[in-house]
């Protein structure tokens, strides 16, 4: 009989914010701090919010203006309790604020330092390696790991909870950062224990929360849990579709999966809604997850496409946005060359700014389709199009020309642009591209000698371009991404130079 598996998921608490607090010799649990680049205006997304600041009703990934608004509301409430309704000072420490109602709530806005967070993450990973072999650890993100603890419990003569606590305490001692953990009989259950159950239990003196689930306790505790979006891999789209068919909980989905064929709710309904993905949804509804750590680490995804996206820090007009598209295309092609890939299909998506409809001077110029964004605001429908090339290539010239033609064809020149996404589809290894024999109808009027000469010249151009691309890549790898810049990268509004100094779209 196979040994019962035991998995542990560990999530570092408000990781970016905790790092910034420790670097200021402050307590991450009591310091009001938000990680955000306020130079991008108050509309910028916050990367992390400290636990004490979240206590004022601030979500984990708000816009900076939401933080400002929530703190302002909290201060208005506190002012009524202060003597003479006047603050005597301010503090960004929750302990001081709780002890003295006459203090105004303050907070620190820390600019992101992605490279530094990666260093911290590496340091924490080395702590896990003191207890667990690398083949039994799967880094899920910069601040979260899965651990297969099955073969370590007897070795250390510990329970899963004791092992998890030992590692978390070591991380706390080494870095000053605390964590939340989930323990389960499969990878799904340990993730759910961490994400949902642990959030509803009291932390210990160090802020540590640890929760456990097996298949039966999962069903008892979470079959009636709402909303569905709290569960791993259930997004708003899935939840909306399920609720439209009367399925509001994991228990509803589980019951639906065992319905008879002549009943309204049965397995076929789920497969009709979600196709093959219904199999995973049904497994998760029952608390099953057949995928093991070994299978996860052995999985190698096929590279069929690469995508590059950018949200502009302010609305760009037609020409300035075109410059950004050109920069992004140029960088994407270099990435293809670096990976030895070629493509024959490019997809461009342009998202317009809300100012197109909120500004009276622009609103009446637009007569096209209007959609509602995720914040409930009206915005012109995005532009979307595809460019197909005659052959697979990684030529900057050919791909850029195709994308520029596509941009001119699909984008409304009167609208302001806010989001740009470029995708290269149908990627294959350039070494695997076989030259297929080409057949053509001969005639007496074509100068085939001139045609062959033209083809030879084109091949020579492509070869020269390829040597230049490889030289640029070599220099950039040795001296940094900004070691070689093009003239367009220095034009007003260009973003490539700044983005080369970022990690994940944020300051390095």
Question: Language-model features: where?
Answer:
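Short aromatic/hydrophobic contact patches that present stacked aromatics
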Residues: 146, 388, 421
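C-terminal hydrophobic structural anchor segments
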Residues: 405, 409-474
């Amino acid at each position: 009989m196979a040994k019962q598996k035991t998995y542990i998921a560990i999530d570092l608490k408000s990781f970016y914010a905790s790092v910034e607090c420790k670097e200021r010799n402050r307590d991450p649990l009591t310091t009001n701090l938000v990680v955000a680049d306020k130079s991008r205006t108050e509309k910028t997304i916050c990367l992390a919010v400290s636990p004490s600041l979240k206590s004022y009703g601030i979500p984990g990934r708000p816009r900076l203006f939401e933080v400002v608004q929530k703190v302002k509301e909290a201060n208005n409430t506190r002012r009524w309790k202060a003597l003479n309704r006047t603050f005597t000072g301010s503090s960004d420490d929750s302990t001081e604020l709780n002890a003295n109602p006459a203090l105004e709530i303050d907070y620190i806005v820390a600019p992101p330092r992605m490279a530094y967070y990666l260093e911290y993450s590496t340091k924490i990973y080395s702590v896990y390696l003191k207890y667990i072999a690398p083949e039994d650890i799967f880094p899920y993100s910069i601040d979260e790991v899965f651990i297969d603890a099955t073969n370590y419990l007897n070795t250390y003569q510990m329970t899963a909870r004791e092992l998890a606590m030992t590692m978390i305490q070591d991380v706390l001692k080494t870095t000053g950062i605390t964590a939340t953990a989930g323990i389960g009989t499969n990878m799904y259950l340990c993730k759910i224990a961490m994400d949902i159950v642990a959030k509803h239990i009291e932390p210990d003196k160090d802020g540590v929360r640890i929760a456990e689930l097996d298949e039966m306790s999962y069903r008892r505790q979470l079959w009636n849990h709402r909303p569905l979006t709290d569960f791993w891999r259930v997004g708003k789209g899935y939840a909306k579709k399920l609720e439209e068919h009367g399925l509001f909980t994991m228990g509803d989905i589980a019951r639906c999966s065992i319905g008879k064929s002549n009943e309204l709710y049965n397995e076929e309904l789920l497969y009709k809604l979600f196709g093959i993905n219904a199999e995973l949804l049904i497994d998760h509804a029952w608390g099953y997850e057949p995928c093991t750590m070994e299978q996860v680490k052995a999985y190698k995804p096929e590279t069929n496409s690469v995508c590059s996206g950018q949200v502009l820090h302010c609305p760009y007009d037609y020409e300035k946005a075109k410059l950004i598209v050109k920069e992004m295309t140029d960088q994407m092609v270099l990435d293809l060359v670096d990976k030895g890939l070629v493509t024959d299909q490019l997809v461009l998506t342009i998202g317009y700014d809300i100012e197109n409809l909120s500004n009276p001077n622009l609103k009446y110029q637009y007569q096209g389709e209007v959609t509602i964004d995720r914040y409930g605001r009206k915005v012109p429908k995005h532009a979307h199009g595809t460019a197909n090339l005659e052959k697979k290539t990684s030529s900057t010239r050919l791909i850029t020309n195709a994308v520029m033609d596509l941009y001119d064809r699909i984008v409304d020149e009167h609208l302001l642009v806010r989001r740009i996404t470029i995708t290269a589809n149908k990627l294959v290894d350039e070494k695997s591209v076989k030259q297929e024999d080409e057949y053509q109808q001969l005639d007496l009027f074509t100068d085939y000698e001139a045609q062959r000469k033209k083809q030879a010249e084109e091949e020579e151009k492509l070869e020269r371009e390829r040597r230049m691309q490889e030289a640029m890549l070599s220099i950039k790898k040795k001296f940094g991404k900004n070691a070689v810049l093009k003239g367009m990268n220095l034009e007003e509004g260009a973003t490539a130079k700044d983005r080369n100094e970022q990690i994940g779209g944020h300051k390095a």
